[in-house]
Amino acid sequence: YCTDIGLRNAKLNFRQQEETHIMENIMYNELLCRGYFVDVGVVEFVNTKNGKKSKTQVEIDFVVNAGSKKYYIQSALNLSDDEKMNTELRPLKNTNDFFKKIIVSKTSMKPWTDEDGILHLGLYEFLLNDHSLDL
Protein backbone atom coordinates (compact mmCIF):
# COMPACT_ATOMS: atom_id res chain seq x y z
CA TYR A 1 0.00 0.00 0.00
CA CYS A 2 1.12 3.56 -0.71
CA THR A 3 1.21 6.24 1.95
CA ASP A 4 0.14 8.96 -0.49
CA ILE A 5 -2.37 8.05 -3.22
CA GLY A 6 -1.59 11.22 -5.20
CA LEU A 7 2.11 10.35 -5.40
CA ARG A 8 1.18 6.79 -6.39
CA ASN A 9 -0.97 8.10 -9.22
CA ALA A 10 1.72 10.55 -10.38
CA LYS A 11 4.37 7.81 -10.40
CA LEU A 12 2.09 5.68 -12.59
CA ASN A 13 1.40 8.68 -14.89
CA PHE A 14 -2.26 8.46 -13.88
CA ARG A 15 -2.64 5.31 -16.01
CA GLN A 16 -4.02 2.96 -13.36
CA GLN A 17 -7.09 4.54 -11.84
CA GLU A 18 -8.58 1.37 -10.39
CA GLU A 19 -11.09 2.65 -7.91
CA THR A 20 -11.21 -0.62 -5.96
CA HIS A 21 -7.46 -0.54 -5.23
CA ILE A 22 -7.49 3.16 -4.41
CA MET A 23 -10.40 2.71 -1.99
CA GLU A 24 -8.67 -0.22 -0.27
CA ASN A 25 -5.44 1.78 -0.01
CA ILE A 26 -7.24 4.77 1.53
CA MET A 27 -8.94 2.47 4.06
CA TYR A 28 -5.58 0.91 4.96
CA ASN A 29 -4.04 4.35 5.55
CA GLU A 30 -7.00 5.41 7.69
CA LEU A 31 -6.72 2.31 9.87
CA LEU A 32 -3.01 3.00 10.42
CA CYS A 33 -3.76 6.65 11.29
CA ARG A 34 -6.20 5.43 13.93
CA GLY A 35 -3.42 3.43 15.53
CA TYR A 36 -4.49 -0.06 14.53
CA PHE A 37 -2.19 -2.90 13.56
CA VAL A 38 -3.33 -4.12 10.14
CA ASP A 39 -2.72 -7.47 8.44
CA VAL A 40 -4.27 -9.43 5.59
CA GLY A 41 -6.10 -12.60 6.54
CA VAL A 42 -6.78 -15.91 4.87
CA VAL A 43 -9.73 -18.15 5.67
CA GLU A 44 -9.69 -21.79 4.65
CA PHE A 45 -12.83 -23.90 4.48
CA VAL A 46 -13.98 -27.18 2.97
CA ASN A 47 -16.45 -27.34 0.08
CA THR A 48 -18.38 -30.49 -0.73
CA LYS A 49 -19.65 -30.81 -4.29
CA ASN A 50 -20.92 -34.04 -5.85
CA GLY A 51 -19.57 -35.96 -2.87
CA LYS A 52 -16.04 -34.60 -3.32
CA LYS A 53 -14.39 -32.39 -0.74
CA SER A 54 -12.05 -29.58 -1.68
CA LYS A 55 -10.34 -26.90 0.37
CA THR A 56 -10.83 -23.29 -0.58
CA GLN A 57 -8.87 -20.28 0.63
CA VAL A 58 -10.30 -16.77 0.52
CA GLU A 59 -8.74 -13.49 1.58
CA ILE A 60 -9.97 -11.07 4.21
CA ASP A 61 -8.82 -7.61 3.13
CA PHE A 62 -7.92 -6.41 6.64
CA VAL A 63 -7.45 -8.11 9.98
CA VAL A 64 -7.31 -5.17 12.37
CA ASN A 65 -5.98 -5.42 15.91
CA ALA A 66 -6.04 -2.97 18.79
CA GLY A 67 -5.29 -4.46 22.19
CA SER A 68 -7.84 -7.19 22.85
CA LYS A 69 -10.08 -6.03 20.00
CA LYS A 70 -9.97 -7.62 16.57
CA TYR A 71 -11.97 -6.73 13.47
CA TYR A 72 -12.28 -8.44 10.10
CA ILE A 73 -12.91 -5.88 7.36
CA GLN A 74 -13.80 -6.36 3.69
CA SER A 75 -13.51 -3.48 1.22
CA ALA A 76 -16.02 -3.57 -1.64
CA LEU A 77 -16.47 -0.75 -4.13
CA ASN A 78 -20.08 -1.75 -4.67
CA LEU A 79 -22.37 -4.61 -3.76
CA SER A 80 -24.75 -4.18 -6.67
CA ASP A 81 -25.77 -7.81 -7.10
CA ASP A 82 -26.14 -10.97 -5.03
CA GLU A 83 -23.08 -12.64 -6.57
CA LYS A 84 -20.79 -9.75 -5.61
CA MET A 85 -22.35 -9.59 -2.14
CA ASN A 86 -21.80 -13.33 -1.59
CA THR A 87 -18.19 -13.11 -2.81
CA GLU A 88 -17.40 -10.33 -0.34
CA LEU A 89 -19.30 -11.88 2.58
CA ARG A 90 -17.97 -15.43 2.18
CA PRO A 91 -14.63 -14.83 3.98
CA LEU A 92 -16.40 -13.10 6.87
CA LYS A 93 -19.02 -15.83 7.22
CA ASN A 94 -16.36 -18.56 7.29
CA THR A 95 -14.25 -17.24 10.16
CA ASN A 96 -14.64 -19.50 13.15
CA ASP A 97 -14.60 -16.94 15.92
CA PHE A 98 -16.70 -14.13 17.29
CA PHE A 99 -14.64 -11.06 16.49
CA LYS A 100 -16.42 -8.18 14.77
CA LYS A 101 -16.94 -8.47 11.02
CA ILE A 102 -17.39 -5.40 8.85
CA ILE A 103 -17.92 -4.75 5.16
CA VAL A 104 -17.27 -1.24 3.81
CA SER A 105 -18.65 -0.21 0.43
CA LYS A 106 -18.58 3.06 -1.48
CA THR A 107 -22.37 3.09 -1.40
CA SER A 108 -23.76 5.83 0.79
CA MET A 109 -25.87 4.18 3.49
CA LYS A 110 -26.70 4.23 7.14
CA PRO A 111 -24.77 1.59 9.08
CA TRP A 112 -26.72 -1.63 9.58
CA THR A 113 -26.06 -5.14 10.81
CA ASP A 114 -27.26 -8.17 8.87
CA GLU A 115 -28.62 -11.47 10.23
CA ASP A 116 -25.07 -12.90 10.39
CA GLY A 117 -23.91 -10.06 12.64
CA ILE A 118 -21.88 -8.37 9.90
CA LEU A 119 -21.80 -4.58 10.08
CA HIS A 120 -22.34 -2.83 6.72
CA LEU A 121 -20.80 0.64 6.47
CA GLY A 122 -20.58 3.23 3.75
CA LEU A 123 -17.09 4.49 2.94
CA TYR A 124 -17.83 8.03 4.12
CA GLU A 125 -19.13 6.81 7.48
CA PHE A 126 -16.00 4.69 7.86
CA LEU A 127 -13.66 7.58 7.02
CA LEU A 128 -15.43 10.39 8.88
CA ASN A 129 -16.35 8.57 12.09
CA ASP A 130 -13.32 7.58 14.17
CA HIS A 131 -15.56 5.16 16.11
CA SER A 132 -17.20 3.55 13.08
CA LEU A 133 -15.73 0.12 13.81
CA ASP A 134 -17.56 0.05 17.13
CA LEU A 135 -21.04 0.95 15.86
Feature locations, PLM:
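A cross-kingdom feature that marks ATP-driven nucleic-acid transaction machinery
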Residues: 1-135
